[in-house]
Amino acid sequence: MYKRNERLNLIRKRVDQYGQVAVKDLAIFLQVTPETVRKDLETLENDKLITRTHGGAIQYNHINKEKSYANKWQKQSQVKERIAKKAALQIKSGEIIVIDGGTTTGRIPQYLNDITQTTIVTNSLKIADELNRAIEEQRIQAEVIMLAGKTNTEQDVVRGHMTNELLQRFKFDKAFISCGSFDTSDCYEFDLEEAHASHIMIQKSQLSYLLADSSKRDAHASYRIDGFSEIDYMISDYAKPQNIEYFNQKHWLQI
């Protein structure tokens, strides 16, 4: 039986070695209950040595820590407005839409007008609020579905197992996704659970749109959402480079 300090050191070593660990695996490895493992993970997270996730933990990286939603909202604001306006034009009456909780996708509701019989699903508290305002102002006729889940107060979203379980029950016409960064083949998010939710949105949609301004190019988000081969359209101020081969010019909607 390991003493507490020994367990903490062993957990840290396994996180460093594998990048992520699961509570159930740690319980077997350390020969303790899952509840004991969760308490150990809470201690390590409070000391900023690991970051807890649903069912486990990942490495703590202060360099890649995501800025708050309010701080991100101000960055590249004019470009994000133009991208969101372009995205809003893709939404038609009668469709079932899903929108994730980014600061670019978060601007879509203010540009929605004259759509009817539309269902819009989101994991963003802010987007749900803005959509309800659009309904009250009679700019749109829509049903808004706010997904359940645990809240990330810094990002104004819900996420986790419950969120993902509910997303699996839908079949969407279109998904509008944001990201923390992108390279020549993939897009990434800062939060593992938010990345997973966005991935499901893409997989459950007939058409998917990635909204990303040029500041996201080669930024430092860590968790892969999806490859560009899985995404149908890119909306960006960034001119399509030759080395991004998955989008033809028609599907790269430059603003």
Swiss-Prot record:
<dbReference type="Pfam" id="PF08220">
    <property type="entry name" value="HTH_DeoR"/>
</dbReference>
<dbReference type="Pfam" id="PF00455">
    <property type="entry name" value="DeoRC"/>
</dbReference>
<dbReference type="InterPro" id="IPR014036">
    <property type="entry name" value="DeoR-like_C"/>
</dbReference>
<dbReference type="GO" id="GO:0003700">
    <property type="term" value="F:DNA-binding transcription factor activity"/>
</dbReference>
<dbReference type="InterPro" id="IPR037171">
    <property type="entry name" value="NagB/RpiA_transferase-like"/>
</dbReference>
<keyword id="KW-0804">Transcription</keyword>
<dbReference type="InterPro" id="IPR036390">
    <property type="entry name" value="WH_DNA-bd_sf"/>
</dbReference>
<keyword id="KW-0238">DNA-binding</keyword>
<feature type="domain" description="HTH deoR-type">
    <location>
        <begin position="4"/>
        <end position="59"/>
    </location>
</feature>
<feature type="DNA-binding region" description="H-T-H motif">
    <location>
        <begin position="21"/>
        <end position="40"/>
    </location>
</feature>
<keyword id="KW-0805">Transcription regulation</keyword>
<protein>
    <recommendedName>
        <fullName>Uncharacterized HTH-type transcriptional regulator SE_1102</fullName>
    </recommendedName>
</protein>
<dbReference type="InterPro" id="IPR050313">
    <property type="entry name" value="Carb_Metab_HTH_regulators"/>
</dbReference>
<dbReference type="GO" id="GO:0003677">
    <property type="term" value="F:DNA binding"/>
</dbReference>
<dbReference type="InterPro" id="IPR018356">
    <property type="entry name" value="Tscrpt_reg_HTH_DeoR_CS"/>
</dbReference>
<dbReference type="InterPro" id="IPR001034">
    <property type="entry name" value="DeoR_HTH"/>
</dbReference>
